[in-house]
Amino acid sequence: MVGLESKYGDYLFTSHAHSDHTKKLKTRKLISSNFTSEIIYNKQPDPPPKGITLYNAGHIIGSKQITINTEQGRIGYTGDLRLSPRFGIKGAEIIDCDYLIIESTYARSTHPPYEEVYESFRKCLKNKGIKIIAAYEVGKAQEITKILNEEGITPIVTEKINRLNQYDNLDQVVAGSDESKDMLKGEYVAILPPKKVNREFATNLSVALNEKVLTIGVTAQPWALWKYDYAFAISDHSDQRELIEYVEQVNPEMILTTHGDDIYFANLLR
C-alpha cells in the first residue's frame, strides 16, 4: 500500500520537498524524486513497485505526480502543480488516470500572466538601492536565483539556499563569506526566507547602512502587498483557470480535491 504523503502505507510517496507535504519515513520505503529524497530524507528513493509511475508536477525542482494502477483502475495524485511553464521550469505533465486527486490551493484565484509579472520584476531590479527578496528557501529561491543570474546579478543567499542552488548550478554568494562582506559595501541583492523580511527590517537595515533598502515579495498571496515595498505574483501553483484546464485534459471518471479551497473547487467542477 502506498501512502500519499500520509503516515500510513508500506511505501511513502512524497511529491516535493516543502515541509507541509513531508511525513516521517520511519521504516517505510520511499517514492519520490532524487532531489526530494536527498533534501528531506538524506537518502536515495527506493524503486517503486510495478504499476507506479512518476511525472513532472511543474511546482518546484524535483516535484512529482504519481499514478498507481489498481484492479479498480488507475489512481492519479498531483501533489502541488503548475501546468504552465515559467522561467527555466517545465510545466506539469498531463497524467492518464481514472480517479484524480488534485490540489486546490489557488482554486479561487486568477494569476496575472507570468510574462507580465516577470517583466515587472525585472524592471524593479533596476531600482536604486539594496534589494532584499523574500523567497522560500526550497523552490522559490531557486527560481528567483535563475532570474537574477539571467539579469547578470549574483545574489547573497543563506547557506541552505546555496546548498539547494547547487542542484541547478546557479551563481550566488553565501552570507557571511568574505565575498559577501565585500558586496555589502555597495548595492546588492539578497534572498532571504519570508519570515525574516518585512518593512521594519528594511528600515533598520537602511539606517544601519545609510542606504536605501527595498523589500520584494514573490508570492501570489495577497498579504504580500502590505508586508513588502513591492510584491510580484510569481506563483509555483496553478490558478483556477489552469486547474480546470488540467482536469479537462485528464478527463477522469472521478475527481477528489485536496489542499486549500477543496470544497469550493469540488463544487465548481460539478
Q: What are these regions, as identified by a protein language model?
A:
Residues 1-12, 19-132, 139, 150:
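His/Asp/Glu-rich metal-coordinating catalytic cores
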Residues 5-10, 21-28, 39-46, 92-95, ...:
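Short loop/helix-cap segments at secondary-structure boundaries that form the rim of catalytic
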Residues 13, 77, 99-101, 132-134, ...:
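Structural motif
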Residues 22, 63, 85-86, 140-145, ...:
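Short, well-ordered alpha-helical microsegments
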Residues 28-38, 101, 153-164, 217, ...:
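Short internal beta-strands
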Residues 60-68, 81, 85-86, 99-105, ...:
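Active-site-proximal loop/helix segment associated with metal-binding centers of metalloenzymes
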Residues 91-94, 108-185, 254-270:
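Binuclear metal-ion centers of metallo-dependent hydrolases, dominated by the metallo-beta-lactamase
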